[in-house]
């Protein structure tokens, strides 16, 4: 019987065989990288919760456009969570739905919200950087490419939040209603 050669990007652990017969070839994901990417679901879903809570707080202080911006961004974070789930499904890995933590809501003003949101995005960016590093460490190139995609999104989000902080600083925090009128989610 002729030996079956698999493409280099398909690891042997991703092949299910019955004797010499290949039953299924699934895209490989290293088990240690899988654990990290599973955590990405929680990171993104927690982000959605945080931004939804921030939007609710901003509504309570009558900054309706900014509240809408944060609630729209919460939906964007849920979309990112779905990307992580879909990536795992495409790898024939069952995505594990995490428990979502109640966000801390100790904001006292808009500045606290903006600062907290930016710091949270830095945290998420660090997570995806570490995930990309681990994927490379285990030569899991598909996972690495996925992590790079998530990092591209993170760069965009850091720019968005940085822009909000710049707008806030231009208004010196005094003209919050004028600030609020200029906030629109892309």
Mark where each language-model region is.
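Iron-associated oxidoreductase/ferritin-like identity signal
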Residues: 1-186
């Amino acid at each position: 019987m002729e030996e079956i050669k698999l493409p280099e990007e398909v690891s042997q652990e991703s092949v299910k065989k019955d004797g010499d017969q290949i039953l299924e070839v699934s895209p490989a994901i290293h088990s240690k990288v899988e654990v990290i990417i599973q955590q990405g679901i929680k990171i993104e879903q927690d982000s959605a919760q945080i931004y939804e809570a921030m939007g609710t707080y901003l509504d309570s202080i009558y900054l309706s456009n900014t509240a809408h911006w944060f609630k729209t961004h919460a939906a964007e974070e849920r979309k990112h969570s779905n990307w992580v789930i879909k990536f795992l499904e495409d790898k024939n890995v069952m995505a594990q739905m995490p428990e979502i933590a109640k966000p801390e809501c100790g904001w006292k003003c808009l500045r606290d919200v903006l600062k907290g949101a930016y710091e949270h995005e830095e945290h998420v960016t660090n997570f995806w950087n570490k995930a990309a590093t681990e994927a490379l460490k285990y030569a899991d190139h598909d996972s690495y490419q996925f992590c790079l995609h998530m990092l591209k999104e993170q760069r965009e989000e850091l720019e968005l939040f940085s822009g909000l902080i710049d707008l806030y600083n231009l208004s010196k925090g005094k003209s919050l209603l004028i600030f609020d009128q200029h906030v629109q989610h892309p």
